[in-house]
């Protein structure tokens, strides 16, 4: 008689444990599970726990060489999703030992690496993760964080202003630098490389870095403010990426940029470590996020990618705009904006926050609002995002009838007007449509932008 019995067995016998008390050191996950017809919810939830931790489809004799109880993921709670048929939220607890310290890459390989192709599930979405302090403390996190960034830039009490240089592809390095200079001179704090500007035949990275640095220094000299341009260091290899970051540091510029999903978490964490060691700020673009987070029933919610970025490291990250979207979306967006900026975030299902998250003083990340916003949105953006944010107007700056610099002036005037109005106790949501026209009286550039 053999000591174990091979053969396919129900996952729920081992991995569904409704009595389990979660530990402070567990990583907790909330999955939205859509089982195939005929598969019970408990079995589907247990299957997720098994396939993303120790399980395989059958009993193997080597199971006897380890303590399964110590290492297995456990589905400890299942609830039906209100308003959806055959959708469940399955809560899974993973023991800390399953994960390599300081590796977002390993965390994702474990939790979402294999289980999403699982046959018994029609669809699967990771909605949220609770990262325990015992795990988050193994990460450096953002290179600098919000407070250090404000001190470096000497800019307080207002959101920061940015602009993506367009047309994003096709400009020569010199003309690109000229566009950067115009925007910074006009009053923006930052300009930005587009996410797909890396090092193409029409503009190699080194030439762009040089002309942008020249633009930054010229604009700083004229305005007396510290300026920056997000120099995109994303490259085909980690070595090349670091080489570009080193060159940016040698030029003395304040900030570089990375596409963290296309570049990958390993590359991103390497760059974040370099940035902290060398005093560079790190701007993160989320290119490719919609591939992962757009489907409501499959993939990962962006709040998970945002938490992962805070652990891997970045000082800014794009976070949608909220303006003009649906109400529910607004609450969800503000939920993960808080997860990026705050130290301690209470569980709040109405904002999509499934777990209380304690970051224990890991530096925060500035959310970047960008995409289709213009000066009329300024009061709403100032109110919704508050001071700790970067507001990015691409076409909203460069589309100004008089050119880039006046477009930048218009944005800066609108922002300062909104901040002043707010500080005087006015209600931006209600009076926004009066505040901007009032400011137009003092600024022909803003008046032209509003027409």
Swiss-Prot record:
Record EC number: 4.1.1.39
GO molecular function list: magnesium ion binding; monooxygenase activity; ribulose-bisphosphate carboxylase activity
Post-translational modification: The disulfide bond which can form in the large chain dimeric partners within the hexadecamer appears to be associated with oxidative stress and protein turnover.
Residues annotated with N6,N6,N6-trimethyllysine modification: 5
Cofactor binding note from Swiss-Prot or TrEMBL: Binds 1 Mg(2+) ion per subunit.
Residues of the site described as Transition state stabilizer: 325
Compartments (UniProt record): Plastid, Chloroplast
Modified residues (N6-carboxylysine): 192
Domain of life per record: Eukaryota
Catalytic activity: 2 (2R)-3-phosphoglycerate + 2 H(+) = D-ribulose 1,5-bisphosphate + CO2 + H2O; D-ribulose 1,5-bisphosphate + O2 = 2-phosphoglycolate + (2R)-3-phosphoglycerate + 2 H(+)
Cofactor: Mg(2+)
Active site: 166 (proton acceptor), 285 (proton acceptor)
Enzyme class: lyase
One Pfam family here: RuBisCO_large
Residues that bind Mg(2+): 192, 194-195
SUPFAM superfamilies in UniProt: RuBisCo, C-terminal domain, RuBisCO, large subunit, small (N-terminal) domain
Listed GO biological process terms: photorespiration; reductive pentose-phosphate cycle
One GO cellular component term: chloroplast
Family indicated by similarity: Belongs to the RuBisCO large chain family. Type I subfamily.
Summary of the function given for this chain in its UniProt record: RuBisCO catalyzes two reactions: the carboxylation of D-ribulose 1,5-bisphosphate, the primary event in carbon dioxide fixation, as well as the oxidative fragmentation of the pentose substrate in the photorespiration process. Both reactions occur simultaneously and in competition at the same active site.
Other facts noted in the record for this chain: The basic functional RuBisCO is composed of a large chain homodimer in a 'head-to-tail' conformation. In form I RuBisCO this homodimer is arranged in a barrel-like tetramer with the small subunits forming a tetrameric 'cap' on each end of the 'barrel'.
Protein name: Ribulose bisphosphate carboxylase large chain
Source species of the chain: Aristea glauca
Gene this protein is translated from: rbcL
């Amino acid at each position: 008689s053999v000591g174990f019995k091979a053969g396919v067995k129900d996952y729920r016998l081992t991995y569904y444990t409704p009595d389990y008390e979660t530990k402070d050191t567990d990583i907790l996950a909330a999955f939205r599970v859509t089982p195939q017809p005929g598969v019970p919810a408990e079995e589907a939830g247990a299957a997720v726990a098994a396939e993303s931790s120790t399980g395989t489809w059958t009993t193997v004799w080597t199971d006897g060489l380890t303590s399964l109880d110590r290492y297995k993921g456990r589905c400890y709670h299942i609830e039906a999703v209100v308003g959806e048929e055959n959708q469940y939220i399955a809560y899974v607890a993973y023991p800390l030992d399953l994960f390599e310290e300081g590796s977002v890459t390993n965390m994702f390989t474990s939790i979402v690496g294999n289980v999403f192709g699982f046959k018994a599930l029609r669809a699967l979405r990771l909605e949220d993760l609770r990262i325990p302090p015992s795990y988050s403390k193994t990460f450096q996190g953002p290179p600098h964080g919000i407070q250090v960034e404000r001190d470096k830039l000497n800019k307080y009490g207002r959101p920061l202003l940015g602009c993506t240089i367009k047309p994003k592809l096709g400009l020569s390095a010199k003309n690109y630098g000229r566009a950067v200079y115009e925007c910074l001179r006009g009053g923006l704090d930052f300009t930005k490389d587009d996410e797909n500007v890396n090092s193409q035949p029409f503009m190699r990275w080194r030439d762009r870095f040089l002309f942008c640095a020249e633009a930054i220094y010229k604009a700083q000299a004229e305005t007396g403010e510290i300026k920056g341009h997000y120099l995109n260091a994303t490259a085909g290899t980690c070595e090349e990426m670091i080489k570009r970051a080193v060159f940016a540091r040698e030029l003395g510029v304040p900030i570089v940029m990375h596409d963290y999903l296309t570049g990958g978490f390993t590359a991103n964490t390497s760059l974040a470590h370099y940035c902290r060691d060398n005093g560079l700020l790190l701007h993160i673009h989320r290119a490719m996020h919609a591939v992962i987070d757009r489907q409501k029933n499959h993939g990962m919610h962006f709040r998970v990618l945002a938490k992962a970025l805070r652990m891997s490291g970045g000082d800014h990250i794009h976070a949608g705009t909220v303006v003009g979207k649906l109400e529910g979306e607004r609450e969800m967006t503000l939920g993960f904006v808080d997860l990026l900026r705050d130290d301690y975030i209470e569980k709040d299902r109405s904002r999509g926050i499934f777990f209380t998250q304690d970051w224990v003083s890991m530096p925060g990340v500035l959310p970047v609002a960008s995409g289709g916003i213009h000066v009329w949105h300024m009061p709403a953006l100032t109110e919704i995002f508050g001071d700790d944010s970067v507001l990015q107007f691409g076409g909203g700056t460069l589309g100004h009838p008089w050119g880039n610099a006046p477009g930048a002036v218009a944005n800066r005037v609108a922002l300062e007007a909104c901040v002043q109005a707010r500080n005087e106790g006015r209600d931006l949501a209600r009076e926004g449509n009066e505040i901007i026209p009032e400011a137009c009286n003092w600024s022909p550039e803003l008046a032209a932008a509003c027409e």
